[in-house]
From Swiss-Prot:
<dbReference type="GO" id="GO:0005739">
    <property type="term" value="C:mitochondrion"/>
</dbReference>
<keyword id="KW-0809">Transit peptide</keyword>
<dbReference type="GO" id="GO:0016992">
    <property type="term" value="F:lipoate synthase activity"/>
</dbReference>
<feature type="binding site">
    <location>
        <position position="388"/>
    </location>
    <ligand>
        <name>[4Fe-4S] cluster 1</name>
    </ligand>
</feature>
<feature type="domain" description="Radical SAM core">
    <location>
        <begin position="156"/>
        <end position="377"/>
    </location>
</feature>
<keyword id="KW-0408">Iron</keyword>
<dbReference type="GO" id="GO:0051539">
    <property type="term" value="F:4 iron, 4 sulfur cluster binding"/>
</dbReference>
<dbReference type="GO" id="GO:0046872">
    <property type="term" value="F:metal ion binding"/>
</dbReference>
<keyword id="KW-0949">S-adenosyl-L-methionine</keyword>
<keyword id="KW-0479">Metal-binding</keyword>
<dbReference type="InterPro" id="IPR013785">
    <property type="entry name" value="Aldolase_TIM"/>
</dbReference>
<keyword id="KW-0004">4Fe-4S</keyword>
<dbReference type="InterPro" id="IPR031691">
    <property type="entry name" value="LIAS_N"/>
</dbReference>
<dbReference type="InterPro" id="IPR007197">
    <property type="entry name" value="rSAM"/>
</dbReference>
<feature type="transit peptide" description="Mitochondrion">
    <location>
        <begin position="1"/>
        <end position="33"/>
    </location>
</feature>
<feature type="binding site">
    <location>
        <position position="173"/>
    </location>
    <ligand>
        <name>[4Fe-4S] cluster 2</name>
    </ligand>
</feature>
<feature type="compositionally biased region" description="Polar residues">
    <location>
        <begin position="33"/>
        <end position="51"/>
    </location>
</feature>
Length: 425
């Protein structure tokens, strides 16, 4: 027992000695084995705070490292860096690094090109329209889809050329397209039976020259909302006979009888958007929507009323190729579509598809010219163009008035592909 206690005392004594002077022992060992080429000893906790912190790399330093060396710069071997940018490089996505959430460093942010920036809406006409919409419990796709042209369409001084896009059947859609900011629900609420009357009342107050009626998709309804659409058109024509009405509908799940019902309701233009080229449709639109079904909807509207103007819209910037664009336009012309519009896809939120490319104004103009050469009746093309953007101005000045012979001299030739009486109903 005595030997055992002696052993314990020895162990305790040695450990006590180690605890009292660990730094001295480490220093002693490091000095014993140190050489001139060895790495410096690991500093203790007390001394680490006195060492200078490593400076973070900067954006400027990264750019400098990516560029030519100093020798190349002086000798002029880096002349290729001074060559003028071609169009594709000049309009490439411009990115900057901005501070992210606390503790998460910086993140990449894409800047909008100057041609996509619009003023904040703030005018008397804009405020009045918004107040009426709230009072009558109406929705607009202008607000729900965060359209960049809302100040231009609602706040213009010329009411006769102004355009409003009323969204019927609620603000919740049964489909979920990857580009659209309208919220999605499997079973939205019931239709408002007063909506057709309220819509007609609002439009008669505003004195607009052109209105676009659109809607969320309502796959939960047996008719897809077609009767609601038709009733709204009839009410508008009763209260404001002079107003031009465009209906931008869904595909009614392929029920072409419902397409015909809306086409014969008294509207002036039947619109249904293909949104993108056929190859990208499965990635952009809800799986229940297909490019071919959209073509059949437009064909069904034309069959129901051959004199009707049919219209569609495409967004650019998803990554579509020229061959895919040509193919889409050829199929649209084969379906006798009269009007097509091109606009830039703008990502509404982070959960939606990212923008693949900001298409330049020059390229939009090129596609406008190409579409006109293919025989489309009218083409609106530009970064901020939307399906209903300045639709009244476009149709009144470029299609409807021309068809009615407004401003033509006696004996002048008047285009009559679409009968006047069909447009005046």
């Amino acid at each position: 027992m005595a030997a055992s206690s002696t052993r314990l005392r020895c162990l305790y004594a040695s450990s006590s000695t180690w605890k009292t002077s660990p730094s001295q022992s480490l220093i002693s060992l490091s000095r014993r084995y140190a050489t001139t080429s060895s790495a410096p000893p690991t500093p203790s906790d007390e001394s680490s705070s006195t060492l200078p912190k490593r400076r973070k790399t900067t954006t400027f330093k990264d750019k400098l490292n990516a560029g030519p060396s100093f020798a190349d710069f002086v000798s002029g071997n880096g002349d290729s860096n001074n060559a003028p940018l071609d169009a594709s490089e000049a309009y490439a996505l411009e990115t900057v690094m901005i501070p992210g959430p606390a503790g998460r460093g910086k993140k990449e942010h894409t800047r909008l090109p100057s041609w996509l920036k619009t003023p904040i809406p703030d005018s008397t006409n804009y405020k009045r329209i918004k107040k009426d919409l709230r009072g009558l419990k109406l929705n607009t796709v202008c607000e729900e889809a965060r359209c960049p042209n809302i100040s231009d369409c609602w706040g213009g001084s010329d009411k006769s050329a102004a355009t409003a896009t009323i969204m019927l059947m609620g603000d919740s859609c049964t489909r979920g397209c990857r580009f659209c900011s309208v919220k999605t629900l499997r079973t939205p609420g019931p239709l408002d039976p007063h909506e057709p009357e309220n819509t007609a009342e609002a439009l008669s107050r505003w004195g607009l020259g052109y209105v676009v009626l659109t809607s969320v998709d309502r796959d939960d309804l047996s008719d897809g909302g077609a009767h609601h659409f038709a009733e709204t058109v009839i009410k508008i024509k009763q209260k404001a006979p002079g107003i031009l009405v465009e209906c931008l509908t869904g595909d009614f799940a392929g029920d072409f009888d419902m397409v015909a019902l809306v086409a014969k309701s008294g509207l002036d233009v039947y619109a249904h958007n293909v949104e993108t080229v056929e190859a990208l449709t499965p990635h952009v639109r809800d799986r229940r929507a297909t490019f071919q079904q959209s073509l059949r909807v437009l064909e069904a509207a034309k069959r129901a009323k051959p004199s009707l103007i049919t219209k569609t819209s495409m967004m650019l910037g998803f990554g579509e190729t020229e061959d895919q664009m040509w193919d889409a336009l050829r199929q649209l012309r084969a379906s006798n579509v009269d009007v097509v519009t091109f606009g830039q896809y703008m990502r509404p939120t982070k959960r939606h598809m990212a923008v693949h490319e900001y298409v330049t104004p020059d390229k939009f103009e090129l596609w406008r010219q190409r579409a006109l050469e293919m025989g489309f009746l009218y083409v609106a093309s530009g970064p901020l163009v939307r399906s209903s953007y300045k639709a009244g101005e476009a149709f009144i000045e470029n299609v409807l008035k021309k068809r009615r012979g407004v401003g033509n001299t006696p004996g002048a030739e008047v285009t009559t592909e679409v009968p006047v009486d069909a447009l005046a109903k």
